[in-house]
Amino acid sequence: NTVGGHVGWSLPSGANARQMFEQPRKAYVLMGLEPEFDCANPQLVVGALKQASLVVFMSAFKHAAALEYADVMLPIAPYTETSGTFVNIEGRAQSFNGVVKARGDCRPAWKVLRVLGNVLNLDGFAYESSEAVRDEVIGKGTEFVAGLDNGLNGVAINLSPVSAGLQRIADVPINFADPMARRAPALQQTADSVAPAARMNEKTLSKLGVSAGVPVRVKQGLGEAILTAKMDN
């Protein structure tokens, strides 16, 4: 739902996510995010969260690691248990209903945010349904979202040359990309969920004096992992 997020004003007018962790804030609200797995620099993010005075953690799952930094944990329904709208890459709005009723005290995330807005006496939190949220974002009765293009507007990528050492190109397996997939036993047994490996060109392995198939310690910043070296030309 990346297009839906863009249409729904997810691009901030102020600091972006990285800046909010590089310059720690006093309070954070996390929704459906497990920073240890979902952020490119988890050490930076978790460090900022532990410094904060207040962290509100909203998730469909009780994430054990979040107990170290979350002050409040609010249960929200997964997308399968709530109504809503996705906008696909074509720009087509696709609305749906929940497959089953949310369990226990879980509520759809939009309802939790609405109540928080009401408690804080903020304007713009009077929604009574997910359809009302949709209609405000894309317009009532909209089938295709207008004004989309393939341009990379407002995005600047500055890459500094590396004179020494190695660069890590990380791949996130499709069945490890979100909290629900990570907790699906059947998905974790597929070929797409094999253990990660340190893949290197044959010449790089030779230069490092490493043989394919042996365990190697990979470090970046304060993090490290033991991976199996594999030749990949």
Where do the language-model regions lie?
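A cross-kingdom feature strongest in bacterial/archaeal respiratory oxidoreductases
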Residues: 2-105, 112-114, 119-123, 131-233
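Metal- or metallocofactor-binding catalytic centers and their adjacent structured scaffolds
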Residues: 127
